[in-house]
Curated annotation (Swiss-Prot):
InterPro entries found in the cross-reference section: Rossmann-like_a/b/a_fold, TilS/TtcA_N, tRNA_Ile_lys_synt, tRNA_Ile_lys_synt_N, tRNA_Ile_lys_synt_subst-bd
Protein name, UniProt field: tRNA(Ile)-lysidine synthase
Location (main, coarse): cytoplasm
Family: Belongs to the tRNA(Ile)-lysidine synthase family.
Leader peptide range in chain numbering: none
Domain notes from UniProt: The N-terminal region contains the highly conserved SGGXDS motif, predicted to be a P-loop motif involved in ATP binding.
GO cellular component terms, semicolon-separated: cytoplasm
Role noted for this protein: Ligates lysine onto the cytidine present at position 34 of the AUA codon-specific tRNA(Ile) that contains the anticodon CAU, in an ATP-dependent manner. Cytidine is converted to lysidine, thus changing the amino acid specificity of the tRNA from methionine to isoleucine.
This enzyme's EC code(s): 6.3.4.19
Catalytic reactions of this protein: cytidine(34) in tRNA(Ile2) + L-lysine + ATP = lysidine(34) in tRNA(Ile2) + AMP + diphosphate + H(+)
Enzyme class: ligase
Cell compartment(s), UniProt: Cytoplasm
Gene name per UniProt: tilS
UniProt keyword annotations, A-Z: ATP-binding, Cytoplasm, Ligase, Nucleotide-binding, tRNA processing
Organism of derivation: Polaromonas naphthalenivorans (strain CJ2)
Amino acid sequence: MAAPVASLNPALAGIDSLFSAFPSSSSLPLGVAYSGGADSTALLLAAAERWPGQVQAFHIHHGLQAAADDFVRVCESVCAKAGLPLHIVQVDARHASGESPEDAARRARYAALATAATARGMQGVLLGQHADDQVETMLLALSRGAGLPGLSAMPASFGRGGMVFYRPLLHIPSAVLREWLVEQPIEFVDDPTNTDERYTRNRIRARLLPALAQAFPQFHATFARSARHAAQAQAVLVEVAAQDLAVVGNPPAIKALQALSPPRQANVLRHWLLLQYATPSAAQLEQLLHQVAACTTRGHRIHLKVASGHVTRLGGSLCYSDAAARAC
């Protein structure tokens, strides 16, 4: 990694912390997901300062807002002044009936970033999510009754579509990044949808975060610590599930499942279903546990809806099949 460069940009601290374990030869060149907002602007300029000539900006144009073209103009202006390559990637983020618009846009964005960055030889993509985003994600998970995966919030790095994504700003509050940009001054845009309180995340941002800051000034650090604890505990559960799956078999043998405690049954069944690209709801998993417990005779049948498919009984084992050509 390059030697530290003197700079007041707080995003550099996050970059240095995340990338201290990576030799530059394995992580460069890098793309930055650049929306034109304050957070990604600070991240882009910090990355360009840390690795001159090794950073390119990627702007995803969803076409979902009237202001989208204004975002592009700001991105072009900032990148031109900084001498950075900018790639505008058009995506179709329309959502299907019954699908969350936010989820559809997020999936389209990551897929487009992975494809565009790979095509230009990037070894990774930096994302601008910060400490406030991490707290919002945890509070959203709590509001939905999430388990450890949800409470783990956002990981610092992950793979998708053959590309590695990094989040170096997860320990830096948004206000710190914004203050630095204003002091320079450096141009950025505010997404008007971020103040639309029809969205739960925006209500959390507008109402809960200010209250938390007043009552618990260190909440960014304490929430981040809780997320790390949850992630560590989840990692242990995944290890135990893999060990149990090796014992009960894949597909799982019903008698072997019944020999496990109910919590371990739930853990290994969730793990098995995730391997089939099926995410069971809490209610579906509870129903499946009841059915496994009731399998005391050969004639007991199981046919439960899980995600887009069904769990059935096939002889002495469970089987998952769905419309995506996975069949028992």
